[in-house]
């Protein structure tokens, strides 16, 4: 109920996936009417929190309600509290209609999850109006959600510098060196030197190299 909602605090979830070729982000469709015109755009899975739940509970609930995903590993990575977050009248009107309550300034806590894109994950997305969009194809989103995604990628790059194992959340247990190299190139948005990259893989304690015929260069497993 709207009376149970804490109107100044929300959570937004950035769920990043990898399909073997490109990085994707999980978005939900948004439809509304503004000044008599119907519009359709997209947003991150997010909403206001309830008075009787903590932030982590809210993030799990919102992600499940909007996408059907549950038991996903979510971690807080940043708070977004710009005074201009709710300055767009279209966003404010949409949120007030959705929550059936007047909305003022809102601070959001952003959560990040890295997941494998597979059929099990995707089985409930359509009925929840959720879908995977390639990062390079993301258009203008609601509120400051483009900025939140940008900051999520910055966080991932900084984290991976010290702990590359984070990226293995995006891969199956067995993967090729080429797939891992592609993933690094997408995350850092630059071409990776093949020879140096293979040396880097060989030094990773949590990677077991599997050489398969006829080509021994691409076999690897985590």
PLM region spans:
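DNA-recognition alpha helix
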Residues: 179-187
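Short histidine-centered catalytic/ligand-binding loop motif
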Residues: 44-52, 169-170
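N-terminal strand-loop-strand
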Residues: 3-42
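Conserved helix-adjacent loop modules within structured domains
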Residues: 163-174, 187
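NUDIX/MutT-family hydrolases
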Residues: 108-117, 121-158, 170-178, 196-197, ...
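Active-site segment of metal-dependent pyrophosphate-handling enzymes
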Residues: 11, 57-60, 64-119, 159-167, ...
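Conserved small/polar residues in nucleotide/adenosyl-binding loops
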Residues: 1-9, 211-218
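C-terminal accessory regions appended to core domains
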Residues: 188-213, 217, 222
């Amino acid at each position: 109920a709207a009376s149970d909602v804490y109107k100044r605090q929300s959570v937004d979830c950035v769920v990043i996936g990898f399909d073997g070729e490109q990085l994707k982000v999980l978005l939900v469709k948004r439809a509304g009417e503004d000044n008599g015109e119907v519009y359709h755009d997209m947003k991150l899975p997010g909403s206001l929190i309830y008075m009787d739940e903590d932030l982590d509970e809210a993030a799990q609930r919102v992600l499940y309600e909007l996408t059907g995903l549950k038991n996903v590993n979510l971690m807080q990575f940043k708070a977004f509290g710009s005074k201009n977050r709710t300055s767009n009248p279209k966003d404010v009107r949409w949120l007030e209609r959705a929550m059936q309550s007047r909305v003022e300034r809102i601070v959001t806590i952003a959560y990040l999850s890295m997941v494998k894109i597979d059929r099990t994950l995707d089985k409930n997305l359509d009925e929840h109006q959720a879908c995977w969009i390639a990062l390079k194809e993301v258009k203008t989103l609601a509120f400051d959600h483009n900025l939140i995604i940008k900051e999520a990628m910055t966080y991932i790059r900084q984290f991976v510098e010290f702990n590359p194992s984070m990226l293995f959340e995006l891969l199956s247990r067995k993967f090729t060196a080429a797939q891992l190299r592609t993933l690094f190139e997408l995350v850092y948005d630059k071409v990776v030197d093949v020879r140096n990259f293979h040396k880097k893989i060989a030094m990773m304690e949590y990677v077991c190299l599997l050489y398969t015929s006829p080509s021994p260069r691409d076999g690897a497993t985590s």
